[in-house]
Amino acid sequence: MAPEDRRRQILAGAVSYFAEVGLSGNTRDLSQRLGVTQSLIFKHFPTKTALQEAVYEQVFLSRIEPHWPALIRDRSRPLLARLEQFYTEYTRAIFTYEWMRIFMFSGLEGAELNRRYLGHLQQVILSPMLEELNAAIAPEVAGPEDIWRLHGSIIYIGIRRFVYQTPTP
């Protein structure tokens, strides 16, 4: 198998594995699951941290669409239409078994991955969303916690679906 194909195969397996067992899962068990040696994993990812970084990039960062900040700031459209479009696209991107479970495990295990993701999301999406909300209604009416409540209520639908495995809209 070509090295890039093998790397993709290991990364896909790691995403599935970490979604099932959490980021504390070990590379020995991962290698057994994939039917490869640990040394092959470390050939493509020199450390477990490097593997987790690749998982973070694939599962979290690669799903943030570059047009979302402009969409949120496009005042030629009503704010409600912008928010509906953003959250339709965003939930389509993140409402997956892997995203939700890795995100939850990362938080429970105290990993830095979701703190970094949330910091990035706040800078790129949520802070501009707050600015637009205040521009649409009245300056300083909404605060950061209002945006987090909005965002959190939508994310909670995914948590119910993929973590609690309960019916959702």
Q: Residue spans of the language-model regions?
A:
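N-terminal intrinsically disordered/low-complexity leader segments
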Residues: 1-5
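Amphipathic C-terminal alpha-helical segment
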Residues: 92, 100, 105, 131, ...
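Amphipathic alpha-helical packing segments from all-alpha helical-bundle domains
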Residues: 102, 111-137, 144-148
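Amphipathic alpha-helical linker/stalk segments
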Residues: 53-85, 131
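Helix-turn-helix
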Residues: 9, 13, 17-50, 54
